Regions:
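Expand to "…catalyze enediolate/carbanion chemistry for C-C bond making/breaking, isomerization
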Residues: 2-5, 12-13, 17-19, 24-241
Length: 241
């Protein structure tokens, strides 16, 4: 399992920016009625904008994904959905099935299930991001959520059809020190799951040596930029505007 150990202060500036985005919407006030609905929409809009900036400036800007730019250019090719409930705590039990999901399944997993089913049944979007700005701030908790999402793909019999890529503000490879710039290849403004179609991935980048070399090339790129530059790039995407 990836190491969730964190040193105080390393990612505080990213956390501060996320807090500004969330508090600026008024969501924390738990206002009733139209005010709460407006706050939730504001949160969703801010998170979607920050996520898109991250794709444009970091993922595409640093060349981390060979076909991300083309996806951005095509209408309806990318879906960015935001889970704004903050209810990320329960799990899917081993006895669950696709037709009989757990009654206590949390909102984020329900949203992930819905997105996965839509991608299995419809040609659009080509790829999708589920962003969870509240409830998965702890990296180890996020890894548990990722495992539950993988389990759901199995329950839905979508293993081999869809695959997941994982991104988190505090992402850390288990073999890397916390200040290794390589960690930024999988760091994002908010915790998120990237849902990809396996057929699309193979068509775009293949399954041979080029595909296998992408992670190593990304690590080399991040390390050549350095920790401070990578942190600044990520921070600029999550600043409240």
């Amino acid at each position: 399992m990836l190491d969730a150990l964190q040193e105080p202060g390393i990612m505080n500036d990213l956390s501060d920016n996320r807090d500004k985005q969330l508090s600026a919407t008024g969501l924390d006030a738990r206002c009733p009625g139209d005010t709460a609905a407006h706050a939730a929409k504001s949160l969703t809009d801010n998170v979607q904008r920050a996520t898109r900036r991250w794709i444009e400036q970091v993922v595409v800007g640093f060349g981390f994904c060979p076909y991300a730019a083309a996806v951005l250019e095509r209408e309806n090719a990318l879906a960015i959905e935001v889970c704004d409930s903050g209810e990320v705590c329960d799990s899917v039990s081993p006895g669950d099935s696709a037709d009989n999901p757990a009654g206590d399944e949390d909102v984020a997993l329900q949203q992930f299930r819905s997105m996965a089913r839509q991608m299995a049944e419809c040609p659009d979007p080509e790829t999708a991001l589920l962003v969870v700005p509240q409830g998965l701030e702890n990296f180890e908790h996020y890894l548990d959520f990722l495992a539950e999402a993988e389990h759901l793909l199995q329950l839905e019999q979508l293993t081999g059809v869809l695959q997941l890529a994982s991104f988190h503000p505090d992402y850390r490879f288990d073999s890397s020190p916390i200040d290794d710039p390589a960690n930024f290849t999988n760091r994002s403004p908010f915790p998120m799951l990237h849902i990809l179609r396996e057929e699309s991935v193979e068509r775009q980048i293949g399954s041979g040596e080029f595909a296998a070399s992408i992670p190593e090339r990304n690590i080399e790129t991040a390390r050549s930029k350095g920790f401070d530059a990578m942190l600044a790039a990520l921070r600029s995407c999550s600043e409240f505007q």
